[in-house]
A protein has these predicted regions:
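Alpha-helical scaffold domains
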Residues: 1-188
Length: 188
């Protein structure tokens, strides 16, 4: 099994090298996305590469271990839905940048069976990208029409109300406001 995973990883990395976009990679580095390796491959192209492989938990976990932007993205796209809960919090803790967190919330976190409850826990956690992922997960849930229960709503509104005084990271503040905009859409 390990040899098959190794072979798939080699095949994926070969495809990544062939699809490399040095200009995009350079621009991303200039914006602070300092991965060990960044091929600069656009998301639609990455999704195309992912479509050539079966969803596979072991392959996804293996790709996630590499500090390569595209491998982390492919890990998200290749993780089977039945395995989402097993990696969710570990991957939030290990997500290096909001770009990865954005795809993590859209593809995995917002599809967890208890996504709303988890997101409320995460917005209460200021470590790393947990709060950011919590707000972005809520944004996706609100877009789908998911409602919070009364206790969750109370916590959400209290944290969001004070976000500018309790949070220094602009990305988290913007994620909070983004989620609030979609929350308010549901209230109308």
């Amino acid at each position: 099994m390990c040899a098959m995973i190794d072979e798939k990883v080699r095949e994926i990395k070969k495809e990544l090298r062939l699809a490399m976009n040095g200009v995009v990679s350079s621009i991303q580095r200039n914006y602070g996305l300092n991965y060990k390796i960044n091929f600069g491959i656009e998301i639609p192209r990455l999704k195309g590469i992912a479509s050539n492989f079966e969803k596979d938990e072991e392959l996804a976990k293996r790709l996630w271990q590499d500090n390569i932007r595209e491998c982390k993205m492919l890990a998200i796209f290749l993780m089977p839905e039945s395995s989402y809960a097993g990696v969710a919090e570990q991957w939030i803790a290990e997500a290096p940048f909001t770009e990865i967190a954005d795809h993590l919330t859209m593809v995995i976190l917002s599809k967890l069976p208890d996504a709303a409850a988890k997101a409320i826990q995460w917005i209460q956690n200021s470590e790393g990208l947990f709060r950011y992922c919590g707000f972005m997960t809520l944004t996706h849930l609100f877009r789908k029409g998911v409602a919070l229960d009364k206790e969750q709503e109370s916590i959400y509104l209290a944290i969001t109300k004070d976000i500018e005084t309790t949070e220094s990271r602009k990305s988290v503040i913007m994620a909070a406001y983004n989620s609030l905009g979609h929350y308010c859409d549901d209230e109308e």
